[in-house]
């Protein structure tokens, strides 16, 4: 690790059979920027049964794992509400030359890879399942793969991860201006 407020800078070429680059420490001031923004995105649900439908299924189901799954689905649907979509919000911080994204879902690694590609000169730290848990956010392509668990149990429609990436990019752009 480099000393505080130092950076490596190209110094000169040194001949040693082959040209070698020499690097030296130089003064570098640390960014003191500290800011936060709330990202908000409306995500559509998959075609999920409403609470009343789940309650009917629970009444018709004998004891066992099916009943347990229905009870869990009911708790999830109760939290989600009977609507067709939900606005999720999550904080994004700029701390110096780093960005922290605290997503309250479990996004595929495509989320952080996309943000890091979009902001190659910034350290982007993505935190999944922060401040609660809503669902998996698989890629569009993952929904078409047979028997892929995260896509099978996700509650949000295909494309919601990509929508979340777009909103995150726009929020980060506002922060770093």
Q: PLM features: residue spans?
A:
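Non-catalytic substrate/cofactor recognition surfaces at enzyme active-site rims
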Residues: 1-177
């Amino acid at each position: 690790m480099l000393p505080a407020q130092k950076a490596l800078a190209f110094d000169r070429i040194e001949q040693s059979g082959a040209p070698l680059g020499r690097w030296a420490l130089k003064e570098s001031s640390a960014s003191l920027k500290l800011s936060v923004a709330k990202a908000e995105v409306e995500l559509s649900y998959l075609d999920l049964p409403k609470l009343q439908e789940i309650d009917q299924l629970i009444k018709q189901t004998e004891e066992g794992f099916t009943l347990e799954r229905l009870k869990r689905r009911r708790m999830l649907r109760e939290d989600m509400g009977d609507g067709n979509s939900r606005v999720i919000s999550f904080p994004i911080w700029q701390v110096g030359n780093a960005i922290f994204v605290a997503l309250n879902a479990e996004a595929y690694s495509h989320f952080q890879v996309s943000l890091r590609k979009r902001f190659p000169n910034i350290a982007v730290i993505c935190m999944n399942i922060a401040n609660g848990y809503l669902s998996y956010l698989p890629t569009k392509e993952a929904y078409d793969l047979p028997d892929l668990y995260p896509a099978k149990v996700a509650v949000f429609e295909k494309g919601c991860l990509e929508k979340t990436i777009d909103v995150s990019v726009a929020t980060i752009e506002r922060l770093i201006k």
